[in-house]
Amino acid sequence: MNPVRSSRVLVTLLVLGGCATNPVTGAREFVMLSEAQEIAMGREADVEVRRQMGLYEDDALQRYVEEIGLALASRSHRPELPWSFAIVDSPAINAFAVPGGFIYLTRGIMPFLSDEADLAGVLGHEVGHVTARHTVRAYTRASGAQLGLLVGSIFSPAASEVGGLVETGLGVLFLRYGRDAELQADRLGAEYAAISGWDPAGVRDMLSTLSRISEGSGGRGVPNWLSTHPDASDRVERVGSTLAELAARMDITGLRVNRQGYLDRLDGLIYGDDPDQGVVRGRDFLHTELRFALRFPDGWEVVNTETQVGATQPGEEVYMVLQLVTNPERRELEALAVDNMRRGGYRLDAGGETAINGL
């Protein structure tokens, strides 16, 4: 959370339910978004992800990831989407996708990938989530349950007008696709890598590496890859079967790995937290510049961005958002908070004020 930047609300989209054909399976399925709405929501979320998380400032590395991602997407089941690939400035070990073809890696995951084939495996996996419409189905499920995902727009004025819709923005960090979807994304990632010229074993290798990373090793402000992509160790064996199937269909020997080239690209990569935005250590959030610390309950997932810090309870039923806002009219804090909640369609049951180091 950067104290000099204030949060803006995020406009949500009104979506109507209907049936659509899955581009990968050809099956008819109920989803809340048409493809046009999916792309529009993705673009909206992309703006918020970039604003709240920020992109990692290395143009050459960004272009490198984008080139590989676009090569994979061009050979996927949905090449016509407006695909975008970017590295966000977070030390967490994660990768995630937004509906419509917007894919993100954190800078924190980059050192844990061994070579270019691993990178293609991660990107291909996330592309698979989009092509098989896992992202859309996850939004549909969350919308049906009226879950307010932890995002910058949790108090958005639009919420009362489009109540029951899933918020975009950083809510993508908490989307779970389920075991079957993860297995399908693994298979698609390996297939996309192979037909694009990369060794599909990179999917297996990156799963093997990430499965050895403990849950607590990479959170640091954003849920890590293992918490949103479960059963990695079991999936390693299943990817082996996928590789055998690919080998029966095409020659996958000698495909691109490029270990040294990948490692050269990482030279100078920043590792760790940015103390100016505060740091997350376990369940503690610490901000040296503002001189305060906050301890969350056990099991809560914490998100720290340039504009806010928030946490969600296991089960996603209770949320907390700590946010710095401008108050040029010097209104009473409780009135300011209640007004924001009311505009968002929320009712205050109980509230009060507290001060921490003069804040």
Regions found by a protein language model. Name each.
Residues R8, C19-P297, E301-E317, Q323-L359:
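A Zn2+-metalloprotease active-site environment signal
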Residues M1-L10:
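Bacterial N-terminal signal peptides that target proteins for export
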